[in-house]
């Protein structure tokens, strides 16, 4: 099922495509994703992690990559949607962790993404019962909430995930009052330096440990430099870093369960199917939903001679006009 390049044959019509979800080993998944993605891809992921590749079965080509993981703690639109903050009680915290998952990587290969609305297909696949069952089996979950955020921030009035009801629904804008995370060797070097000086300062089993480590180091640095010219310079740097982040559009899926909020918040553990929408979340129905949209897209591009034929892999040697 593997191929030399993670691409799709751009000459095939959407009506002829068939897909398979494949859970790849981490090393293989990382290699493929780094070929097509411009962002920094994390290899060490705390908490739950499901790495998937989507295979187009006729051409035996990979058309996209997905990584699902444990959700972030702070999410204002989620709190508003659920009618409360899950961290307020141990019961709600346990229920949330048992039922919720977040999409961190939803990246189509190119030109599949452009020619066939590949991003919408991958996002919809994340909302499928088949994905939910994979998570339930792997982590003994009772999955009923999938969430993700838009690629672009609030400077964009729309997102690639708009127009995806009932699979994905827009639920509001995230808060943007946070500092971009440090990754890779700079982060590890800084953490090691501080731990060598004062010992381990965030428990090994703490949730969102990397964020807590980063915020604690910033707080200690501010305290140590308080009242000094260096402290003023550091505070200004932090303020500038805060201005780099934008509010993101937050999207959620309930997998076709009408009482998902009560289950996520621990008020009950019995899921109730929405008779109008539940079946729409089966993978076969999701693919057919996508196929109609992709057919319109593909045939329009063909008619206007705008089909992209070039395989896009991230080498740094040429300019790509799609951030992913």
Where are these regions (language model features)?
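Acyl-donor binding region in acyl/amide transferases
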Residues: 26, 30, 48-50, 56-200
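Extended, well-ordered protein cores
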Residues: 10-15
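Short loop/turn motifs at secondary-structure junctions and domain boundaries
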Residues: 42-47
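General structural signal for secondary-structure boundaries
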Residues: 28, 35-37, 151, 182-187, ...
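Short, small-residue-biased leader/transition segments that mark boundaries at the very start
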Residues: 2-5
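Extended, Lys/Arg-enriched charged tracts that mediate electrostatic binding to polyanionic substrates
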Residues: 19-41
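Generic detector of solvent-exposed, compositionally biased contiguous segments
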Residues: 16-18, 123
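Long, compositionally biased intrinsically disordered regions
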Residues: 192-324
């Amino acid at each position: 099922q593997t191929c030399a390049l993670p691409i799709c044959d751009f000459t095939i019509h959407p009506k002829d495509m068939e897909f398979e979800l494949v859970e790849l080993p981490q090393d293989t998944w990382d290699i493929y994703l780094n070929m097509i993605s411009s962002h920094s891809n994390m290899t060490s992921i705390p908490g739950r992690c499901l790495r998937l590749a989507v295979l187009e079965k006729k051409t035996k080509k990979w058309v996209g990559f997905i990584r699902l993981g444990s959700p972030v703690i702070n999410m204002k639109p989620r709190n508003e949607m659920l009618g409360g903050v899950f961290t307020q009680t141990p019961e709600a915290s346990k229920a949330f962790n048992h039922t919720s998952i977040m999409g961190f990587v939803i990246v189509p290969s190119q030109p599949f993404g452009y020619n066939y609305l590949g991003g919408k297909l991958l996002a919809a696949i994340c909302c499928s019962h088949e994905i939910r069952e994979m998570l339930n089996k792997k982590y003994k979950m009772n999955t009923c909430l999938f969430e993700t955020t838009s690629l672009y921030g609030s400077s964009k009035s729309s997102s690639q995930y708009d127009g995806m009801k009932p699979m994905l629904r827009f639920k509001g804008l995230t808060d943007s009052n946070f500092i971009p995370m440090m990754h890779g060797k700079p982060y590890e070097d800084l953490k090691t330096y501080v731990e060598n000086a004062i010992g381990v300062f965030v428990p090994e089993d703490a949730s969102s440990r990397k964020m807590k480590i980063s915020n604690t180091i910033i707080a200690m640095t501010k305290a140590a430099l308080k009242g000094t010219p260096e402290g003023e310079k550091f505070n200004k740097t932090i303020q500038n870093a805060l201005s780099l982040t934008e509010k993101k559009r937050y999207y959620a899926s309930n997998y076709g369960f009408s009482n998902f909020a009560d289950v996520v918040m621990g008020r009950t553990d019995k899921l109730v199917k929405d008779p109008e929408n539940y079946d729409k979340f089966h993978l076969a129905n999701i693919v057919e939903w996508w196929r109609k949209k992709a057919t319109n897209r593909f045939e329009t591009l063909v008619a206007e001679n705008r089909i992209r034929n070039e395989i896009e892999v991230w080498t740094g040697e040429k300019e790509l006009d799609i951030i992913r």
